[in-house]
Amino acid sequence: MLYWLGLVLKSHIFLFNVLRYITFRALIAVIVSFLITLVLSPIFMRKVTALNRLYGGYVREDTPETHSKKKFVPSMGGLIIILSLELSSILLMRLDIAQTWIMAFTVFGFAIVGFIDDFVKLKNKKGISARSKMLGQIIVSFVSASLLYFVMHIDTHIYFPFFKSLKLDLGYFYIVFVMLILIATSNAVNLTDGLDGLAIVPAMTTAFALGIISYVAGNSILARYLEIHYVENAGELAIFGMAVVGAGLGFLWFNSFPAQMFMGDVGSLGLGAALGMLAIMSKQELTLIIAGGVFVVEALSVIIQVSVFKITKGKRVFKMAPIHHHFELNGTPEPKIVVRIWIISILLAIFTIATLKLR
């Protein structure tokens, strides 16, 4: 919206010319999304805390007993994150390109699935069934993948990091590939969201790294110089990536230890879908594995735990999965686990950006 305002007013007021630049709008996105989250969160917390107390509170069943004290901490704080992202993208991204609207739809769709689950948990602690939850994600991801393929006509090649020209064309199977990325990423973020402040910082660092790469991929000169695949209008995705950073900072203000609110499934599923879409639309699907390495490890720990338990009929690799609970049961304080994972996520983001030259 502001992009077009800049085009209209630049001939009358020179300062409005800066609204044409992606870098300036990305900076504004950080500030706007941060302020929206910071201002609305206290109001939201008061409302949801009252609901939590009315229905007896909620804490995940698959957590250590020490988490029982968090039962009245308001969940669904991710609503504010998603609202902030949607408003920031509509305000600051170009509205004449498919990327803006497909991103907005995908994030909103996954967030709705998470919100329904969170809302049901207020009365029924188990939430909606796993089958219903997965069905919702499949429907949203299929629509998003179809929009990418049939409307945006996205390139169906997969480009491999560290290689200049290695690529694989999936053709129609790219639709299924997109669905797998969106569902896997959203659920991986959901699994990671188990300690105060744990999931939001890796989400921010992943979005930042993918935002930087999106900017490069959308700039024909930089893309040619660094020998990565050029994607028309991908630079606009950098604005969304920076909005995730701003909204994340605002949320972390209240989510850091001891947490005053949690993001809930509405936040984790929505954020996961956002990260997946950033990677997909910038043609960095495989780079997401590096940038979001924390989420990959957390998800793998659950897969390993469940698989070994079923195969051996009762044996476990970890004391509890996801792996952050294993560290917790080993006696490592929650804040120390969280900060260490933050450090790892920052290093992964740095390495992800470095892959631009490592090819």
Swiss-Prot record:
Family matches, as PANTHER family: PHOSPHO-N-ACETYLMURAMOYL-PENTAPEPTIDE-TRANSFERASE, PHOSPHO-N-ACETYLMURAMOYL-PENTAPEPTIDE-TRANSFERASE HOMOLOG
Task: Indicate where this protein is primarily found.
Answer: membrane
Which EC number(s) are documented for this chain?
Answer: 2.7.8.13
The protein, known as = Phospho-N-acetylmuramoyl-pentapeptide-transferase
Which chain regions cross the lipid bilayer? 24-44, 72-92, 100-120, 134-154, 170-190, 197-217, 234-254, 261-281, 289-309, 336-356
Membrane topology for this entry?
Multi-pass membrane protein
Print the organism lineage.
Bacteria, Pseudomonadati, Aquificota, Aquificia, Aquificales
Q: Which family does it belong to?
A: Belongs to the glycosyltransferase 4 family. MraY subfamily.
